[in-house]
Amino acid sequence: MPINEALFAAMKAASYIKPNAGKSYKLQRVAEELIAKQAPDNPKCRVEDAFAPMADGYAVPLRVFTPLVAYGAPLPEALEESSANGTPVASAISAILPAVLPKVLPKIPIKESTSSGNADGISGNANTELPSVTPRGTILFFHGGGWTTGGINLYTQACAHMAVRLQRRVISVEYRLAPEYRFPTAVEDCYEVARQLFAGELPISGVGGSVDVDHPQRAAPTAPAGGGDISATIPAPDPDSIVLFGDSAGGNLAAAVSLMARDRGEFMPRTQMLLYPVVGNDYNPETSPFESVRTNGTDYILTAQDMADYIDMYRSSVADLTNPYFAPLTAHDLSNQPRTLVLSAEYCPLRDEDEAYARRLQLVNDNVSCYRIHDGIHGYLLNTSAVGLVATTYRIIEHFLDGTPLEPAPGTGTTANAPEGGDAWQDVL
């Protein structure tokens, strides 16, 4: 459907003035940390930090989100209002910050922490007066950012919202970033965290400690001394209740972890959710088999050139391009995969490859769903002004997780730009 003309003009301008990802990822990281510091705490969710040890001595930081209140009738409006009025972490703003950051950096006010928790203003004991609810399961979340940016700080607000909205504990994984750590480091980090979670070996500890924002360049971090142990409150989950979820590069990692798990036989995810995931390897408009790379690859913040840069920064060699753990769509065998939800975005350059991946999964697996989010652009999960898009996404996710049919509801939950009576999504399969 046609996107709002003013919004399109703004995105097109931002897409053209921002530097390519290969030149701006370091400034992007700084911009994201500044944005993360402005994000308000979610009073309906307990947030705690932890670490997962890797075989090479590295400790992967985790952030654990536990809902404190039920998502009841009076809560949606308050929560959506809080999201809409929160710090704007819109993709467009985030994407152009590296271009202007050197000029505005001294002028950006940094919110002083009023929390008694860690250095990021997240308290391990926040809202203890609120009654806890029993989470319905555990979501292991892998963040987006082209494998080079993003992190648990930037995604704190989104993950807290996710935990409350879905009434599930969310564990956000701070895997090591490229280009400092290239393929397969990120996917191996994510795989090992998932393995420990499924095996009941994940040592959720270090609560109240600070997660160093520069940790991707830190050789061997360790959990802070004296950190509390909350393992008693995080029992080994029922494997059937664990969901792998990732957006963008995180969706790539979730899909790759599922393929790895099938091949290695140490555990097997039952459910995965992929939000505008990276599953391909060719973003050259002249050679890509997918039309969305050409139609959506210049004007909607994430460009085809950005994707090519991310691929180059993530891969260790040309051979990686055809490794299914790098580009899941290249896998010759997609059988024995979890029940899968793929969500594509209408104006995303990855749209067609996402839907192609869902179709290939459907050929050899049961219970695969794929929906195209109308008016969606890449990265909208972090856009606090995209309330309609996020609400639509969670509505689809809720039905998928509950196993209930998703019936079209004209006029309900549609995006602001959808025609009156139109639906906010399209069933692709």
Residue map of PLM features:
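C-terminal auxiliary extensions adjacent to catalytic cores
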Residues: P2-N4
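Alpha/beta-hydrolase superfamily serine-hydrolase fold, recognizing
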Residues: A9, A14-K18, I35-Q38, R46-L429
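Catalytic-loop region of hydrolases
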Residues: G22-I35, P40-D41
